[in-house]
Curated annotation (Swiss-Prot):
Gene Ontology biological process terms, A to Z: cognition; GDP-mannose biosynthetic process; GDP-mannose metabolic process; glycoprotein metabolic process; motor behavior; muscle organ morphogenesis; negative regulation of biosynthetic process; negative regulation of nucleobase-containing compound metabolic process
The protein's assembly and partners: Component of the GMPPA-GMPPB mannose-1-phosphate guanylyltransferase complex composed of 4 GMPPA subunits and 8 GMPPB subunits; the complex is organized into three layers, a central layer made up of 2 GMPPA dimers sandwiched between two layers each made up of 2 GMPPB dimers.
Entry GO terms, CC: cytosol; GDP-mannose pyrophosphorylase complex
Record SUPFAM superfamilies: Nucleotide-diphospho-sugar transferases
Originating gene: Gmppa
Swiss-Prot/TrEMBL keywords: Cytoplasm
CDD domains according to UniProt: M1P_guanylylT_A_like_N
Name of the featured protein: Mannose-1-phosphate guanylyltransferase regulatory subunit alpha
Region (Substrate-binding domain): 2-251
Amino acid sequence: MLKAVILIGGPQKGTRFRPLSFEVPKPLFPVAGVPMIQHHIEACAQVPGMQEILLIGFYQPDEALTQFLEAAQQEFNLPVRYLQEFAPLGTGGGLYHFRDQILAGAPEAFFVLNADVCSDFPLSAMLEAHRRQRHPFLLLGTTANRTQSLNYGCIVENPQTHEVLHYVEKPSTFISDIINCGIYLFSPEALKPLRDVFQRNQQDGQLEESPGSWPGAGTIRLEQDVFSALAGQGQIYVHLTDGIWSQIKSAGSALYASRLYLGRYQITHPERLARHTPGGPRIRGNVYIHPTAKVAPSAVLGPNVSIGKGVTIGEGVRLRESIVLHGATLQEHTCVLHSIVGWGSTVGRWARVEGTPNDPNPNDPRARMDSESLFKDGKLLPAITILGCRVRIPAEVLILNSIVLPHKELSRSFTNQIIL
């Protein structure tokens, strides 16, 4: 039997995802029409022998998370449970803390997936590679260009055996163009090195009597504390993929991930893609429209558009490279490009909401999304436009390269602004 663990983090993470993470936990943000981690769960559920999927994180189990878990269990006919950490424990601390739940039933191996990645999840190929070698740790790797590789965990492998000889998390100088995808397959024996790190933390004096210092020993970073330490010892191997992959750290990267997933729907879920029908809107490229959305027949949608539940799209609307969330309204003849329109927001007639894409360099096949700061030299860098929850944009204005926080009612145009 097999299990899967999805690391969803907590509210102290995902600050670059604001203001979108104000309304829902980042792992539940809709990407290509479904919550971000549903893509992970779908991939895990398709692996033969999968018996249980565990979510580990520090979020409070609110109504949204509870409803998602119930819906996932019904849809995939698998136990999907949430295990809440008592404190943020890092990428490995939760695995060690909940080791008994993970190992219950004696699984052959278990997948570990970070929630904030977009991928085609070649889990069956990883399982096949694991069964050939049966080493404790198998990492999924891909390639990046020299400059961008410094923003990731870098892997030096033996090209014949694929053993990880050296691992450095976000090195200061170039190490390798092979990077860590944040998707792993572990044997039960992989928890022993995590126990060693925990015991070493105790011996180093990080565990004290006061309750507030308890997470010190429990905090384990897989990348620095385990992978870097065990590289070159015959325990960690890498499985390379040339499939789709991207981190989802910012709202801009969510829009890029939506494009990747919508493109993949052509193979995996063609029923989710809208088709042009007589009397319906004009569809260009890959578009997702929730069944409850109301779209005027003269609207032009796509490519890379995702329209959520209860959305209203008026006559003559042009929508491209954008996500429109639950309950939003785009009135007649609005134009929305490279933007995310928040829950319940309204864009007035003849208004234009536009952002600047920060996609990877299309001329470099190994280019990845840049996770740069919002600011440079005190100025807001051009990026996608984000309208938070229940924002009202008046008629005939331009909102360009701006971020509007929730519950704002604007009265004029804005360019390169954060509207607080």
